[in-house]
Amino acid sequence: MILDIEMLRSFYASYSESVAQAKATVKRPLTYAEKVLFAHLFDPTQLRSYKRGVEYVDFRPNRVAMQDATAQMALLQFMNAGKDKVAVPASVHCDHLIRADVGATQDLPEACKTNKEVYDFLKSVSQKYHIGFWGPGAGIIHQVVLENYAFPGGMMVGTDSHTPNAGGLGMVAVGVGGADAVDVLTGQPWELKMPRLIGVHLTGKLSGWATPKDVILEILGILTVKGGTNAILEYFGEGLDSISTTGKATICNMGAELGATCSIFPFDQNASEYLRKTGREEIASLAQMNAAELRADDEVLADPSAFYDQIVEIDLSKVEPHLNGPFTPDAATPISHMKAKGPANDYPMVVEVGLVGSCTNSSYQDLARAASIARQAYEKGIEVKGQLIINPGSEQIRYTAERDGILDDFKKIGALIMTNACGPCIGQWKRHTDDNTRKNAIVTSFNRNFRRRADGNPNTFAFIGSPELTVALTIVGRLDFNPATDTLLDKDGNSVMLDAPTGFTFPPKGFAVEDKGFIAPSEENANVEVVISPDSNRLQKLAPFAPWDGKDLTDMPLLIKTEGKCTTDHISMAGPWLKFRGHLQNISDNLLMGAVNAFNGESNKVKNQLDGAYVEVSTAAKAYKAKGICSIVVAEDNYGEGSSREHAAMEPRFLNVKVILAKSFARIHETNLKKQGMLALTFCNKDDYNKVQEDDRISLTGLKEFAPGSKLTVTLKHKDGSEDNFEVEHTYNDTQIAWFKAGSALNFAAKK
């Protein structure tokens, strides 16, 4: 059985009482997010009001989800914990390692062959430790979770930053690094800074070409990629009723691009219907019995500004189709503005490829509505100018969409149907192009559009839109086509318009599938052997990191001073590097290769202070490590934005980088650095960033007095003999300081 139904029955039997106790203790009405948080305290006796954005709280999530690229490192760490089985229900999803090339029929067998060693490892670990296993082709982790595991009022963590997708079905679902997941898998408390609460008030109703995707694209323009840091976005208002559960999941999914801890919608009839349509009638009934506590209290809705830290107002009737980009998901542009904005910013205006899919927009409803546009192009005889690529979200969706003729609608206009996997969204795309460095534009229904992310080309301008708009712009081949107002020519030269998209929320004949690709957790695990070859270049057993030696860090060479945006894609690239996600030594060769060096404006070219040569970042780091020298990275704002990949923290740790000094950090990455025993520090005065010079030797003092709220001192020794001194700060609590001293959180846990 896929679901752990006894766990769910037990949860719902006590949920409303837990919420009632919370309200009685804090003596006030609660938002929905607060209800879920308080119902999942690791130690219910610690129930009290917590200072949002400041205090750390221990929680007990209901389950863990892991995708194949991050599960490798998470499970390698779990294997060192000495447990016989996982403490909570868990699942592994093989969706990240499948490369999109010529189509699913050939790509999936090739992936199974290429990644056999990793798939065998993940399958055997899953069998040994009682973890559900979704094989290659089964689907994208977050779509599979929504269809099978998500439940209103629950809490889950996932080793992927878009885990908040499950908030569309009323979960507090948080993206974490593997070390955080191991805490939950081993039954330990999971620590999280009590989030701030941003209330998003939805009024009106979407119409025409406007979609749920456009709601979150508009919010990104308002809040930016930093605006949700250490916050939960909770949606409320009469506008909720007009948005489907999968539409709500799309909105929650891209809350990750705001830096939000997660996003959440309350339980409603749409959620109940989704549960029933996906074969979870009992959960729908259990949720209905608790419905009063699966939403914010009436007093909160009557006076939201008294309960939320910030309110965002969105009138759905005024939402326009958006194209966000290029290079950052918060560059929000209503499609009606693109005719002026495109040429003014020298965008390449020809759309060469349109890509529909990803964990953000690959539901049945997404494909059905996008197919209605493809169908019009075929029926009206409109020449399709761009290449269209489709990645269904799960085998259940693919099978049902094929049965219902949806995939045929795409194929009739020349679309390629790729595997049920992430594919191009994470750089797993063998793009067929005449020049992989040429300036060009693509449009996607994905969630991120960082430079080089999709195809490795720094000159690909990637724009994010809805599946419907993506198909329309691909048909026309222009970025500045507004389907609500513009005409195009049919095969006879007549002016025609594309009608607004239509499509069923659920398949009229119900969902269908022959083989979901799922292997249930097994109780017969005693004889399962997990084999890792010592000669493997893809999997490597982990050795513990060394503990702190009790001394200040002196005369550290500057490894790199990064300039501008430095995401986890810049720190640890995906694409061709995904195959090394289970081998820390090998993947460390990509350390910071995408980051821009502030001193020369180039990527992956830094000065090795030992000989003055300019080399790759990892080469310099390895040279310092070989001499027993630790180094430091200096960065700007929101360092580590993007995915949850803990490799972006483990790689510098492995190469003896001890400190990341930034203007600010993204939430998940800051936690990952702490978990690996690194020092994630911030400038007290951001202008001190400008004092750091290329040849500096940098010292950090005050570590013997390292304590919550304490300041540390940085000394820059410049090449000319002069010095600069300034203070830096941190957000470490006592437990996190203990992780640093032990060498990592895993080391600390092993000592307890």
Predicted regions, residues:
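Long, structured ligand/cofactor-binding scaffold of large enzymes
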Residues: 8-11, 15, 20-195, 581-633, ...
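Acidic, glycine-rich flexible loop/linker segments
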Residues: 488-505, 670-739, 746-749
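Mobile "lid/hinge" segments at catalytic clefts and subdomain interfaces of large enzymes
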Residues: 3-4, 68, 151-284, 416, ...
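Short glycine/threonine-rich loop-to-helix capping motif typified by GTGT followed
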Residues: 47, 147, 151, 243-249, ...
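Extended C-terminal subregions enriched in glycine
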Residues: 379-429, 435, 643, 649, ...
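Terminal amphipathic helices with adjacent charged low-complexity linkers/tails
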Residues: 42, 46, 51-60, 74, ...
